[in-house]
Regions:
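Mature catalytic core of soluble alpha/beta enzymes
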Residues: 4-8, 15-339
Length: 339
């Protein structure tokens, strides 16, 4: 996550020809190293658009100054540097969420694996290709995180935890969507789409139809979503988080071998399997979709399929490389993609 720039575009979309008395607003800007968009139906909302815009900006700034490992002045960056930091609600909530998914995944989604990600160059430091001895040393130094953070006079001391290095990238963007959506629900918004790299949507779009989301086709080193979509997924008007995780944007090659940014925290090494991307739909939260998508990418195809089939409230779409080298797809029973 990077600094939030106060650049917004507000568009009012009148729907006179549809017969609906809706008034949609779009707020766009820059956050977390990319662009974001918030679309919402202002029908029945007594809060001015400008206030909503300012509130969204303030929340994104708060997330950046609390949780961004790229912002050296953020609470998590200061914590990772060994500094005692205030136990703010956002800091505590993210830690609790991250630890929950660490426990639920059996350690495969691990916020304390920051040193491993840094060592491979996929974290907050410019490193690359560590030795096996170096990885073993890092794994040995990764401690067990308690269920709750110990506090003293409203402060959290990393030394009391063995000075862990936290990296929330596996759920940060999904969590950010949830924070913005929580604010919108609080002011009475029913129809919304929050897109901060990951997505939370609910209700219908300006045309009165359920929100539709394009699913990327995995193309190596595509820095931005490509124009080539694998298909369109439609929400059916129900609230849900939508997240795609994959190894086709962040990786590097050495001696002819591809090293992807998905790392197994238990082995300390990038995964090597035929699963190219995992799209997860969660009825609960975008943070859950984010965490489970990462979890799937660590597991690989067969175990990811089993996870999605055995998880109520989750649907998934997996793109993988078949034995013939061609891309193939698998979808859980409740996931419908329109090609």
């Amino acid at each position: 996550m990077k600094k939030v720039f106060a650049l917004f575009c507000i568009l009012l979309m009148a729907l006179g020809c549809s017969g609906r008395q809706d008034r949609y607003v779009q707020i766009s800007g820059y956050a977390q190293g990319g662009t974001y968009t918030v679309k919402l139906n202002m029908k029945g909302i007594g809060v001015p658009v400008e206030t909503i815009r300012d509130s969204v900006e303030a929340l994104l700034t708060q997330i950046d100054t609390t949780l961004s490992g790229y912002n050296r002045k953020s609470l998590v960056a200061r914590f990772n540097a060994g500094e005692r930091v205030p136990a703010t609600p956002l800091f505590l909530e993210m830690y609790a969420l991250a630890r929950h998914y660490w426990e639920r995944s059996g350690g495969l989604v691990d916020c304390a694996a920051g040193p491993i990600f840094d060592a491979w160059g996929f974290g907050f430091k410019n490193s690359r290709f560590p030795t096996e001895e170096g990885i073993s040393s890092l794994l040995g130094g990764m401690g067990h995180l308690p269920e709750t953070l110990p506090q003293e006079q409203g402060m959290v001391d990393p030394a009391a935890l063995g000075n862990p290095c936290l990296n929330y990238n596996a759920i940060a963007q999904g969590y950010s969507c949830d924070v913005i959506a929580r604010y919108l629900y609080g002011i009475g918004v029913k129809d919304m789409l929050v897109d901060i790299g990951e997505i939370w949507c609910d209700g219908v779009n300006p045309s009165g139809k359920p929100w539709a989301v394009g699913i990327d086709r995995p193309i190596d080193q595509a820095e931005e979503p490509s124009d080539e979509l694998d298909g369109i997924w439609t929400s059916e008007g129900k609230p849900c988080g939508v997240v795609t995780s994959g190894n086709y944007r962040k990786f590097y090659k050495k001696d002819g071998r591809k090293y992807a940014h998905t790392i197994n925290p238990k082995t300390g090494f990038p995964v090597s399997h035929n699963l190219l991307s995992a799209t997860v739909i969660s009825a609960g939260s975008a943070a859950e979709a984010d965490a489970v998508a990462t979890w799937c990418m660590v597991l690989g195809l067969e175990e990811a399929q089993a996870l999605l089939l055995d998880s109520p409230g989750l649907e998934g779409y997996l793109i993988f490389e078949g034995e013939d080298g061609e891309m193939k797809e698998w979808a859980s029973p409740g996931f419908t993609l329109r090609k």
